[in-house]
Every structure is written in C-alpha cells, then in structure tokens.
Amino acid sequence: DALPIYNVSSFGGASVKRIHRPVNAEGKTVSVGSYMIPLLQENCEKAGVKMMLDTTATEILTDANGAAVGVKATGASGETVTVNAKAVVLATGGFGANLDMVVKYKPELKGFMTTNAPGIQGQGIEMAQAIGAATVDMDQIQIHPTVEANTAALITEGLRGDGAILINEEGQRFIDEVGTRDVVSAAEIAQTGSYSWLVVDQAMADASSVIQGYIDRK
C-alpha cells in the first residue's frame, strides 16, 4: 500500500518543492523515519517477508565461482545464522558512526561528531571488500549544516525549506539556506566560531511537531 505522505516542501539544493512529508491527526508535519518504518514493516509482513532483528551479518558467502550466494550472521543470543540465497542485495548503508573509518578516508573530518545511528559502522562495505568488491568515492562523506552541538541531533533541513534562516555570531545571514549541504556547511564553518543559529518563527513551530521535539529534547 502507498504511504500517505502528501505534505510537500523543499530541501537543500532542490529547484522546486518535491520533498514529501507525513502529517499527524492535527495536520502537523512529523518525522519521516518514525512514521514510515512501522508502515513499511507492516507491508513486509503482509508480503511474507521474513525480518531478522538483532541479527548482525558477519560474512557474505560465495560459491566456487565467487558469486554471492548467502550471508552468515550472529543472532541475538550469539548463535550463528546462515542464510542461503540465489543472490545478495547489499543495503547496509555507510560508515558515518565509525569515526576511525571516517578519518581514514577523509582526515579533515577528525574531531567532527556524527548524527548517524551507532550501528552505521561500515561492516557491509568491509564484508564486500573481503570478497573482492571494489569501492569508489569513499572520501565523499556528507556533512550536515544543522546539528545541535550538545546532543548531536540532526535538525532537518526541511525547516530551512519552510523558511528558517541561519545567522552567524554577528547576527547576520551568510548563505542561501536552501543551498546544497556541502555549500551551506562550508559557509557555516567559515563563520566566526564555525557555528550558526537556526531561527524559526512561531508560525513554523505551530505547524510542526518536529520543532517541538527539538525543543523538548533540550
């Protein structure tokens, strides 16, 4: 079934409004991930897809010709789990929470925090390399301009798409807030103290449960 995400806004670098977001019963926008994952899980269950939670993949299995034919993993109780398959789809994400790996490929990011989930350690990449997979553009690590420094909470750029502005220590705007993340981040780093304030108005706060969530988190 299609997910009902009909609120449309702009994100960084977009030439037109094309970012679809969900809303709650009050008509306020809500976080996409926490809204979408339960619905995707429900649809997977309807389709008979078997989900193995708390299970960590450790090795991609290959046949005599080197083709990927399954995965070996460790289950929640420490048991070995083997999944044999006709093919393996690698969709493990990146390595943003593995700060040593980040610095290995992009030394200038040493000292940066991460907004990634703790499990984003790059194991999928390493498993693929172990069976001969090539990598490309490993240094192309995205940094985000709106991160709360004390909690590492990522503040969605959807707020900037809705009209929030960035001001520096001198109280001045310094960039087009809906530029691409690399451009906005570079401009922010160049400001005094390498930080900025994200300013929203009351109308934006009233229309978004996400903003209230940021306030409550502090």
Each language-model region and where it sits:
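Conserved redox-cofactor binding core of oxidoreductases
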Residues: 1-81, 98-101, 144
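Short Gly/Pro-enriched turn/cap motifs at secondary-structure boundaries
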Residues: 17-27, 52, 115-117, 154-158, ...
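Glycine-rich loop(s) and the adjacent beta-strand/alpha-helix scaffold that form part
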Residues: 76-148, 152-153
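An anion/pyrophosphate-binding glycine-rich loop and adjacent beta-alpha core
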Residues: 121, 125-127, 131-218
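Short, glycine-/Ser/Thr-/acidic-enriched flexible segments
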Residues: 58, 77-78, 88-90, 95-96, ...
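Short capping micro-motif at the N-terminus of alpha-helices
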Residues: 71, 83-85, 176-177
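Electropositive phosphate-/nucleotide-binding environments in soluble metabolic enzymes
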Residues: 30, 34, 38, 115-118, ...
